[in-house]
Amino acid sequence: MTTNTVTRKVAWLRVVTLAIAAFIFNTTEFVPVGLLSDIAASFHMETAQTGIMLTIYAWVVALMSLPFMLLTSQVERRRLLICLFVLFIASHILSFMAWSFTVLVISRIGVAFAHAIFWSITASLAIRLAPAGKRAQALSLLATGTALAMVLGLPVGRIVGQYFGWRTTFLAIGVGAFLTLLCLIKLLPLLPSEHSGSLKSLPVLFRRPALMSIYLLTVVVVTAHYTAYSYIEPFVQNIAGLSANFATVLLLILGGAGIIGSVIFGKLGNNHASVLVSVAIALLMACLLLLMPASVSETHLAILSIFWGIAIMMIGLGMQVKVLALAPDATDVAMSLFSGIFNIGIGAGALVGNQVSLHWSMADIGYVGAIPAFLALVWSVIIFRRWPVVLEEQPQH
């Protein structure tokens, strides 16, 4: 915990550094979405084939989040962060040097290992390091780091890839991670493991039907989103017939709209989280259904992307808030499960998009994605009626 001897300025610097780390980790997860065509060209592959790296990355995170969290549950958190950053940086150097697609995938697995540990401990660390009475704002800052990864990280990474090659994008992320590591070493105090939970926590969490229902909702709605989002760059260029530069602009718009979603949730989420999540899922479903019809013009796609970005950010924030509220006694285990389940959804969505693109038509990714979105909408209405009080509680720390 931050003590009385720690100034509010230092406490906020620590949280901001974690938010920057969140920005970097999310940038590297999202950025291949904007680089698929370039990566495919360099290895003489089809774009849809290279998309499998998104699924592999996400499913490695999903499989390893809980085992790694349990293996490191007693490790002092500052040391753990330093070690995972070293792995993260080394893996990006390998991505830069990758001489084959297989080597690139191996390097991404290394990044995924670091990612799996990072996201299982970061939310609870931000809460511990925040100034007194500012824990909700600390979580919001982490969410902002995530949003900025979509707003700036993904499109800037794509621009760097367009002009200097996709390898340079990965190298730049590694350099950014190195600078962030130096800040973490300087700013963070010793952070003994706290409320990390253990294997004993799992049966307790699994006996919470409201929490399990939120996990199921998460995987279904994330699958819906990533079915289309994973292939938005080749969709814009190959299906809509628009320029590579517009694909970059569209990613910028979609990410920027996420900040609007974050602001809306920050204003209304305390008292109306369940309603906001259901409305956002309905909005996501509408955007997916309208993706192909909107592809007739840049203006239509840009407007659709605004609503899409708002929807997915409100969904992500809503899920995280509810998980923290439902598992205050084992935050690291609960968030590790959440990270894993979220990434199962990413991997499933990317795989569905991959199969639709290869065996059907990339033009249909929005329509196919709308199916799990509809199922998620129905499920959200059911569970928010079944556990209305429990699911409106906010995390207490």
From Swiss-Prot:
A GO CC annotation given for this chain: plasma membrane
Keyword Protein transport: no
Membrane topology annotation: Multi-pass membrane protein
GO molecular function terms noted in the UniProt entry: carbohydrate transmembrane transporter activity
Membrane-crossing segments per the record: 15-35, 51-71, 81-101, 103-123, 136-156, 170-190, 209-229, 246-266, 273-293, 301-321, 333-353, 364-384
Alphabetized CDD domains for the sequence: MFS_NepI_like
Keywords noted in UniProt: Cell inner membrane, Cell membrane, Membrane, Sugar transport, Transmembrane, Transmembrane helix, Transport
Cited Gene3D superfamilies: MFS general substrate transporter like domains
Entry's family note: Belongs to the major facilitator superfamily. SotB (TC 2.A.1.2) family.
Function field: Involved in the efflux of sugars. The physiological role may be the reduction of the intracellular concentration of toxic sugars or sugar metabolites.
Protein name from the UniProt record: Probable sugar efflux transporter
Organism of origin: Escherichia fergusonii (strain ATCC 35469 / DSM 13698 / CCUG 18766 / IAM 14443 / JCM 21226 / LMG 7866 / NBRC 102419 / NCTC 12128 / CDC 0568-73)
